[in-house]
């Protein structure tokens, strides 16, 4: 009996020792896991009280714009696309609360941008500070972004807000991430890269880059950006991403540029089903000559043209005639305007690229334009800075030239 009791005591003692040991190992494992998580910088833990505070603020703020969203213009398709007017009304309403507010509109002017500018200037000075920004998407989603700088590292506490079927706001997520690197440019762009999972933890590369224009463009630059460069961009034609002038117009990809000039002239996209057998010469040449100083004879010589059918070839963009590049995703932005002695105007344009590189001037080029009194204009040339020409990927013509 005594032996049995001693054995029970020894077993109990051993159990207690193992429990303490395992508990210590578990605690150590949790500490190591927590340290590893903070080292990675993403999916960081959010204090329960802070998370609840953020969620409640989001619901209160976004509830102010629920009627604007509910009755606003959401487009005619199955996917919601809010009109610029609706987005601007939502932006203005939240801005009344004093928050900086941006939207997904190209060349958007941030409301209450002074607060974000002050925050970033204090970060540059090494001061501990924070700022909250609301970001409105044309899809109807709202993001609350709280940036915190501790004097050394910057963090982003982000919350996403959507809508239920009754147009009530619902918080879809709250996340906390360290910002791996950031900068605030002279032009007023806040550029940063978030810490994100990397291979082999994930099978595909995750892009944590983001660009936010804090200091708005001047009204003149905004208008000229919308009128002269945004309709073209860099993806599917070479008007803005190659060197050319009135003495060297043969390198332009006329067959690709046509659909963008068509959109500029008529205010609607080209219907590809209408031109399966090519574009009639008169239509093609009329559109091209409206925006470029070329003759019909020159277009027929330099573009892909069928003399027998008197049509110009056209094809949709696809993997067979386009190579994806960072530049192709960039947003052209007019940053300076110079009036020339001959009456023409030269626009200094920066290619703002968010994808992976977060660069507010991937390339800089000068676009010369001839504006007429009736409001029409022609492009006369484009020159890329000599030290940046190497950043231009080789252009693939939409349709192979013979």
Task: Identify the function of each model-found stretch.
Residues 2-12:
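Bacterial N-terminal signal peptides that target proteins for export
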Residues 21-24:
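C-terminal motif of bacterial Sec signal peptides marking the signal peptidase cleavage site
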Residues 30-402:
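Mature, Sec-exported extracytoplasmic domains of Gram-positive
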Residues 26-28:
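Bacterial signal peptide processing site
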């Amino acid at each position: 009996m005594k032996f049995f009791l001693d054995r029970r005591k020894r077993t109990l003692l051993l159990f207690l020792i193992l429990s303490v040991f395992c508990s210590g190992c578990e605690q150590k494992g949790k500490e190591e896991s927590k340290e590893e998580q903070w080292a990675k910088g993403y999916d960081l833990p959010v204090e329960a009280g802070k998370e609840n505070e953020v969620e409640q603020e989001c619901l209160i703020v976004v509830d102010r714009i629920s009627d604007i969203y509910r009755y606003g213009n959401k487009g005619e398709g199955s996917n919601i696309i809010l009109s610029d007017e609706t987005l601007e009304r939502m932006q203005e309403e939240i801005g009344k609360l004093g928050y900086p507010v941006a939207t997904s509109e190209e060349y958007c002017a941030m409301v209450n941008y002074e607060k974000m500018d002050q925050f970033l200037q204090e970060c540059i000075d090494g001061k501990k500070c924070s700022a909250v920004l609301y970001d409105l998407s044309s899809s109807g989603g709202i993001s609350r972004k709280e940036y915190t700088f501790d004097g050394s590292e910057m963090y982003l506490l982000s919350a996403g807000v959507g809508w239920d079927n009754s147009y009530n706001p619902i918080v879809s997520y709250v996340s906390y991430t360290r910002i791996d690197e950031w900068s605030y440019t002279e032009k007023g762009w806040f550029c940063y890269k978030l810490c994100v999972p990397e291979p082999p933890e994930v099978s595909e590369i995750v892009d944590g880059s983001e660009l936010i224009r804090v200091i708005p463009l001047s009204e003149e630059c905004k208008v000229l950006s919308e009128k002269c460069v945004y309709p073209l961009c860099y993806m599917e034609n070479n008007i803005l991403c190659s060197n050319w002038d009135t003495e060297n117009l043969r390198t332009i990809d006329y067959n690709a540029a046509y659909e963008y000039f068509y959109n500029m002239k008529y205010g609607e996209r080209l219907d590809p089903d209408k031109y399966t057998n090519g574009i009639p010469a008169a239509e093609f040449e009329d559109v091209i000559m409206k925006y470029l100083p070329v003759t019909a004879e020159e277009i027929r010589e330099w573009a892909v043209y069928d003399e027998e059918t008197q049509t110009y070839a056209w094809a949709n963009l696809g993997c067979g005639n386009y190579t994806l590049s960072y530049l192709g995703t960039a947003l052209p932005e007019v940053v300076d305007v110079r009036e020339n002695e001959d009456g023409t105007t030269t626009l200094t344009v920066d290619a703002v690229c968010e994808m992976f590189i977060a660069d507010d001037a991937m390339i800089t080029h000068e676009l010369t334009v001839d504006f007429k009194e009736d409001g029409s204009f022609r492009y006369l040339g484009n020159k890329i800075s000599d030290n940046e020409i190497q950043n231009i990927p080789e252009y693939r013509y939409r349709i192979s030239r013979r």
